[in-house]
């Protein structure tokens, strides 16, 4: 069959993280959608948001956004020849997000054994892991982007730091704690080892970063290789449990609560935020430097979405952006469609899922799919 339009393609995604954002955007641009779901974790996609009713002229079903569910016993089974052949038979373009990385848990296999066309640069995904070489810190250095000071040795701690250690039971989650001295680092680390949250090795391998006091803003960018343009699709901030609950308490009660509860930083979602327009130019320039560094060091560089998770720090009389985390793939931020930035560019607000689908649709039209997939 000769492929002619988006109707001949299916947009595929792992059933987790931001799959609905991907699927809604794809449906709105006339694509078929497929979610790879683990058995027993499928109702969100196979029932509650399943496509229903006849398609409209745009290719959009009257209700829902998931056309088809492909079942696997474990998400890692997506690497099997059987599942890959099925995805290729359906002419799928696969959209990677954080859960894809986490559940497959094998970047070498993603790069070398997953042969379904992937929207984006697969080589960038592993940068998210701070233990990789190179990693996100290296890319930020190459791009001359400011990030929190790191301490390689806890004996050098001379200010308030945030310690990020891999959890024992959930390896892709990190256990966080604060310390302001080597003694406090040792005390707090031992406490979490005793509770079973982290291991001794996890503490030895922990990332120790200066705690930056500022306002959290995630800059969700999209780089279009077709238009050679960087776009700010939207901005948001994290919601974390039980941290958000602690912050709602008056300070004396926060101190009292920590006698019985440990503060945790489990991500539970995002809230849309806006920026002062005076900060947009700096944010865009930082994004451009990131794109340029990736193109020079990790060809073909950035393709599509990425997020620079940042803190806005007051440096009188200006504001300064400090990037504390990089998401080199589709962000888990469906609420960014509520921010105005894509609307300023396109005349209507776009979700990241819609922006990705627009790029794929244009690449099909220009016969340049190979330019946006790896």
Segments (PLM) and residue ranges:
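Active-site nucleotide/adenylate-binding loops and adjacent lid/helix of ATP-dependent enzymes
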Residues: 12, 126-217, 222-233, 277-284, ...
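Beta-strand scaffold of nucleotide-dependent catalytic cores
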Residues: 209, 217-254, 320-327, 336-338
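A long amphipathic alpha-helix within ATP-dependent nucleotide-binding catalytic cores
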Residues: 247-320, 359-374
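N-terminal phosphate-binding or glycine-rich loops at protein starts, especially the Walker A/P-loop
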Residues: 6-29
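Short N-terminal binding/cap micro-motifs at the start of the first secondary-structure element
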Residues: 19-24, 42-44, 171
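Conserved N-proximal alpha/beta basic substrate-recognition cap immediately N-terminal to
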Residues: 45-52, 63-161, 168-171
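C-terminal active-site "lid" helix and adjoining low-complexity regulatory extension at the edge
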Residues: 3, 317-374
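Short internal beta-strands
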Residues: 31-40
């Amino acid at each position: 069959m000769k492929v002619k339009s988006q109707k001949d393609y299916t947009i595929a995604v792992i059933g987790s993280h931001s799959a609905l954002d991907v699927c809604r955007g794809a449906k709105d641009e006339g694509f078929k959608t497929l979610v790879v779901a683990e058995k027993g974790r499928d109702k969100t996609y196979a029932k509650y948001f399943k496509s229903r009713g006849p398609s409209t002229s745009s290719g959009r079903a009257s209700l829902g956004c998931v056309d088809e569910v492909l079942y696997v016993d474990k998400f890692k089974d997506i690497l099997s020849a059987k599942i890959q052949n099925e995805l290729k038979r359906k002419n799928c373009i696969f959209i990677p997000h954080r859960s894809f990385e986490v559940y497959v848990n094998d970047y070498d296999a993603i790069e070398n054994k997953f042969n379904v066309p992937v929207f984006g640069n697969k080589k960038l995904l592993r940068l998210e892991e701070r233990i990789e070489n190179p990693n996100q810190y290296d890319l930020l250095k190459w791009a001359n982007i400011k990030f929190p000071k790191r301490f390689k040795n806890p004996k050098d701690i001379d200010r308030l730091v945030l310690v990020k250690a891999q959890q024992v039971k959930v390896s892709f989650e990190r256990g966080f704690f604060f310390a302001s001295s080597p003694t406090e680092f040792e005390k707090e680390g031992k406490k979490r080892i005793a509770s079973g949250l982290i291991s001794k090795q996890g503490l030895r391998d922990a990332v120790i970063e200066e705690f930056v006091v500022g306002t959290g803003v995630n800059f969700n960018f999209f780089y279009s290789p077709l238009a050679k343009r960087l776009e700010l699709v939207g901005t948001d901030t994290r919601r974390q449990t039980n941290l958000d609950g602690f912050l709602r308490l008056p300070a004396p009660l926060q101190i009292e609560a920590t006698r019985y509860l440990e503060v945790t930083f489990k991500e539970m979602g995002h809230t849309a935020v806006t920026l002062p327009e005076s900060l947009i130019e700096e944010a865009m320039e930082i994004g451009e430097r990131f794109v340029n560094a990736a193109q020079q060091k990790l060809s073909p560089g950035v393709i599509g979405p990425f997020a620079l998770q940042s803190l806005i720090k007051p440096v009188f009389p200006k504001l300064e952006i400090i990037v504390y985390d990089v998401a080199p793939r589709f962000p888990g931020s469906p609420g960014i469609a509520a921010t105005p930035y894509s609307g300023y560019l396109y005349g209507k607000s776009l979700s990241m899922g819609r922006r990705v689908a627009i790029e794929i649709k244009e690449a099909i039209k220009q016969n340049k799919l190979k330019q946006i997939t790896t």
